[in-house]
Amino acid sequence: MSSPIDIVEKKLLSDHWFILHKYVFDLKRKNGGVVRQIREVYDRGDGATILLYNRAKGTVILTRQFRIPTYVNGNESGMLLEACAGLLDDYSPEECIRNEAIEETGYAVGNVEKLFDAYMSPGGVTERLHFFAAEYDESLRDNSGGGVEDEDIEVLELPFSEAIAMMNDGRIKDGKTIMLLQHAIIRGWFAKG
């Protein structure tokens, strides 16, 4: 199958935090025509996220941390409630999420279940996020969490029902976290009886 595009130009715009390129390309349309488009693509690498849950207690582990993009887009405090997550760097998705779980939440989860992967903002960002879930209990507690280096992460253990209420009333606004909580509902992890 031939490529649907011909890249005419690729220009590096920034590589300070992640990589931002400008692409000029000719897109072959279904009707046979060709249209030239110009897009900026932000390459931040792929990532992984996990919902830690305890079925017996009816709880989930979430984190709260400052996110500058939310602050500049109307979130007064900049703080965001979210599931543990991180960039893959040079790790497999499974290795990454186990490491992130220990660093951010303090739980050393061994058995992680891969749920799915998804492009989170495909209109301008390359990132594909790998979604996982794992059961936790106090025997898996390795440390107090909170992140590493310049991270300042608060670890929260919440009743699943409260997390769902927070999602429904807008206190949880993070897309990956909403997807994981909805997945828990679909799978019936906290269904009564």
Swiss-Prot record:
Which superkingdom?
Answer: Bacteria
Coiled-coil regions in this chain?
none
- For this entry, list what GO says about its biological process: nucleoside phosphate metabolic process; ribose phosphate metabolic process
Q: Which residues bind GDP-alpha-D-mannose?
A: I38, R39, E40, R67, A85, G86, L87, E104, E127, D150, E151, K176
Cellular component annotations (GO), alphabetically ordered: cytosol
Q: Which GO terms describe its molecular function?
A: hydrolase activity, acting on acid anhydrides, in phosphorus-containing anhydrides; metal ion binding
Q: What is this protein called?
A: GDP-mannose pyrophosphatase
Source organism? Pectobacterium atrosepticum (strain SCRI 1043 / ATCC BAA-672)
Q: Which gene encodes it?
A: nudK
